[in-house]
Each structure stands twice: as C-alpha cells, then as structure tokens.
C-alpha cells in the first residue's frame, strides 16, 4: 500500500546562485558527504545538486512533515543501488518519521525518480508499505 507521495520542482538557476553565493556553506548544510562527492565529480554540478535537492523536498512531503518535526536536510540521502537506480537512505528524524508512518507488520520501501530539463529539476517520491 502507498503511505506517502511527494513531488518537487527545483529551479537549477536557483541552485547555481546558491552554489556561487554560499559555496560549501550551502552544500554542507543540505547535502551529505556522499551526495557532495557525487555531484562535485560532474562537469555540470548545479543540475546534479538540484535533482538531489528536489528529491529531499519530495521525500519530506511524502513523509508528511515537510522540513519540520525533526526532519533535516541531511537525514535524507540520494544513493544509487548497484543497478544504478536512485533511492533514498533515511537517517535521524526522517528515519523516525518513516517508522512512525509505517503500519505494524509492514516494511517501508522508498521509490524515487529524478530528472532535469533545464532550467528545472524534478523528483517524485513514493513510499510503499509491504507486508512482512
């Protein structure tokens, strides 16, 4: 059963401005070390950061909290499965909220899709509860 859905659009130009203006202060506040390493390896850093930013916003919406109630930016990390497919690793307040919305006798599975078509990046997150 689906227990959460979230989507977000992010303007890549806004992320570009944040990278230029705030640099590491911005990236260290919002992104995990793994996300920074992956995005910083790319020639076009801003679209990579924008996709991840959109995924975090979409995940916070799917959790039903937004960026509140103990859910922080770095509690949600975009990682890739061995197949290359993206997913989200939740820790801290995000993991606690996921546990709170997951029905007893079920386990949560987080699906994410990312795309960009400049000047926009987009993410959709679906949280599914599967019987154990």
Curated annotation (Swiss-Prot):
Q: Which residues form a coiled coil?
A: none
Enzyme Commission number, as recorded: 2.7.8.7
Q: What is the lineage of its organism?
A: Bacteria, Pseudomonadati, Pseudomonadota, Alphaproteobacteria, Hyphomicrobiales
Species whose genome carries this gene: Methylobacterium nodulans (strain LMG 21967 / CNCM I-2342 / ORS 2060)
Q: Which residues bind Mg(2+)?
A: 8, 57
Question: What processes in GO biological process is this protein linked to?
Answer: fatty acid biosynthetic process
Where does it localize?
Answer: Cytoplasm
GO terms for cellular component? cytoplasm
Which chemical reaction does it catalyze?
apo-[ACP] + CoA = holo-[ACP] + adenosine 3',5'-bisphosphate + H(+)
Q: Which family does it belong to?
A: Belongs to the P-Pant transferase superfamily. AcpS family.
Q: Which domain of life is it from?
A: Bacteria
Asked if the Swiss-Prot or TrEMBL record annotates the protein with the keyword tRNA-binding, the reply is no
Q: What cofactor(s) does the depicted protein rely on?
A: Mg(2+)
Q: Describe the function of this protein.
A: Transfers the 4'-phosphopantetheine moiety from coenzyme A to a Ser of acyl-carrier-protein.
Q: What is its main location?
A: cytoplasm
What are the record keywords, sorted?
Answer: Cytoplasm, Fatty acid biosynthesis, Fatty acid metabolism, Lipid biosynthesis, Lipid metabolism, Magnesium, Metal-binding, Transferase
Q: Which Gene3D superfamilies match?
A: 4'-phosphopantetheinyl transferase domain (3.90.470.20)
Q: What is this protein called?
A: Holo-[acyl-carrier-protein] synthase
Q: Name one GO molecular function term.
A: magnesium ion binding
| Pfam families registered for this protein in UniProt | ACPS (PF01648)
């Amino acid at each position: 059963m689906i227990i959460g859905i979230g989507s977000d659009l992010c303007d890549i130009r806004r992320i570009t401005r944040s990278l230029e203006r705030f640099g590491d202060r911005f990236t260290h506040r919002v992104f995990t070390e793994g996300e920074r390493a992956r995005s910083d390896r790319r020639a076009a850093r801003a679209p990579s950061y924008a996709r991840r930013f959109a995924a975090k916003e979409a995940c916070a919406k799917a959790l039903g909290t937004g960026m509140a109630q103990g859910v922080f930016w770095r509690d949600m990390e975009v990682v890739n499965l061995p197949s290359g497919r993206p997913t989200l690793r939740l820790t801290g307040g995000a993991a606690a909220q996921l546990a709170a919305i997951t029905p007893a006798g079920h386990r949560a599975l987080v699906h994410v899709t990312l795309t960009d078509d400049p000047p926009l990046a987009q993410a959709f997150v679906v949280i599914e509860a599967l019987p154990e």
